[in-house]
Regions:
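Long, charged/polar, low-complexity intrinsically disordered N-terminal extensions
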Residues: 55-67, 75, 92
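Short amphipathic alpha-helical patches
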Residues: 24-28, 38-43, 233-244, 429-433
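Non-catalytic regulatory/interaction regions at protein termini and inter-domain linkers
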Residues: 429-444
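Short amphipathic recognition helices of helix-turn-helix/homeodomain-type DNA-binding modules
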Residues: 3-56
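Hydrophobic protein-protein interaction segments
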Residues: 69-420, 426-427
Length: 444
């Protein structure tokens, strides 16, 4: 119809938006659209803006503690300059700590935190913010809570000790223009309270005032809920996924594994693990047993018609080229052999009679290290790699975010996925090309 009406690209987009909104409602449509955009644009391998800090310039204003009275700031430039100084003053310390009560859509503060977190892994950031308590759109036709997650994920990946906690409120009312100073930044020697439009701020330096504000912030922080559970070691990751799989089995809910690369860890054999796990790895034998047990549970109890596994053509190619799976750090094991790579892909395809395999019909190449999602209706986690190729597992704790991912995967349109015949044809073509390429290289 859009083609018949000879609509411009912008008119076609608006027309299709209106059509889908009529079908499913505005909140559901924009929530699903927000999840899709998050997945398509996600990458924690590329830093945001490059900030070059000159200590002499940053130190122009004296913000050390012990002063009397307050310092007012007027205008966005002066407020942002004060924020930069506070962040910089803590980030250069060996054990700096920044406590912030700001919304994730404050791009200036979030980008600074990411940059300083990358520069100083010992930096601790406590972040308290408000999640929207309803499905109404706040701005730009986006789901507000998912937009918050999108802003936060790069800081999760920057390497510092980042602790994000949330509370619920009506965001529109919470940050309206009649709130005096809804935002707060706390450091060792200073506290900066500022307005939602970043036009006005007050700097506090008196120790008695700072002590009271720290106690209040810590009290609020403890009352709030953690946005995610971060798992930084192989052992904690294995323990978490094992628990999650047990919960998946116990639940009647459908389960979804959405990955760029096929979910192959459940197909690894004990022989493969014995051959490729690094010999010097601490707890090596325990890890072999744990991964083998995980594979056994996956094959005997998880891979059934309640399980849907999404993967991409690009992910198949990546696995064949590298011999590595997404779920484990590359320093823990050597790449799988040529024959093992072929065998794993064929074993994966053979699962189509037991589980639902869905190859994504990609219109554009996804990020090299994209967002992996494993969810059912009750719990789940996100998995991604940082710029330094460190694996980050984030257990999803916030219900509306969990529901958004689950609903998106449950409702993926047929036109976004290849048919089974197309899937088999494309994968076989990839395997044939891989074998042919390997044969050519071997004959050189």
């Amino acid at each position: 119809m859009a083609q018949f009406m000879q609509l411009t690209p912008r008119e076609k987009t608006d027309f299709m938006d209106a059509f889908y909104i009529t079908q499913m409602g505005e909140e559901v449509y924009y929530r699903r659209k927000s999840v899709g955009e998050l997945i398509e644009t996600f990458s924690c391998r590329e830093g945001k803006k490059e900030y070059i800090f000159h200590e002499a310039e940053i130190a122009k204003l004296e913000l050390n503690g012990g002063g009397s009275g307050e310092i007012p700031f007027r205008g966005t430039v002066h407020v942002r300059h004060a924020i930069l100084q506070l962040f910089f003053g803590e980030a250069v310390k060996e054990d700096g700590k920044i406590s912030v009560l700001v919304q994730p859509d404050f791009d200036f503060a979030m980008e600074l935190l990411q940059v300083f977190g990358e520069q100083n892994p010992n930096l601790t950031i406590q972040h308290l913010f408000c999640m929207n308590n309803n499905e109404k759109m706040v701005s730009m036709r986006k789901n507000y809570n998912l937009s918050c997650l999108q802003k936060i994920l790069p800081i999760c990946a920057c390497g510092c000790d980042y602790r994000a906690r949330y509370y619920y409120d009506n965001v529109t009312a919470r940050l309206n223009e009649f709130r005096l100073f809804p935002y707060l930044i706390l450091t060792e020697h200073c506290a900066l309270a500022f307005s939602a439009d970043y036009q006005n701020a007050l700097l506090f330096r008196e120790e008695t005032t700072l002590r009271m504000m720290r106690e209040m912030f810590e009290g609020y922080f403890k009352q709030s809920e953690p946005l995610f559970e971060r798992l930084d070691t192989v052992q904690s990751q294995l323990g978490y996924t094992e628990t999650l799989i047990r919960h998946f089995i116990a639940s009647d809910s459908p389960r979804y594994f959405f990955q760029r690369m096929p979910c192959l860890s459940g197909l690894l054999t004990a022989e493969m693990l014995e051959r490729h796990l690094v010999k010097e790895m601490p707890g090596r034998e325990q890890m072999i047993r744990a991964v083998a047990q995980y594979a056994k549970v996956m094959q005997t109890q998880v891979l059934d018609k309640k399980t849907t596994m999404f993967f991409s053509e690009d992910g198949i190619k990546s696995f064949l080229e590298t011999g590595r799976v997404d779920e484990y750090p590359k320093e823990c094991y050597s790449p799988l052999d040529f024959d093992e790579r072929i065998a794993l892909i064929r074993r994966f395809l053979a699962l189509r009679d037991r589980a639902n395999l869905r190859m994504i019909r990609e219109t554009k190449e996804r990020a090299e290290h994209a967002l992996n999602i494993s969810v059912n209706a009750n719990e789940g986690y996100l998995l991604f790699q940082t710029r330094t190729e460190r694996l980050i597992y984030l257990g999803i704790r916030e219900p509306s975010v969990l529901m958004a991912f689950y609903d998106y995967l449950e409702s993926m349109k047929p036109e976004e996925l290849c048919t089974e015949e197309e899937m088999l044809e494309r994968v076989e073509a990839i395997l044939h090309e891989f074998v042919a390429c390997h044969s050519r290289e071997g004959s050189i």
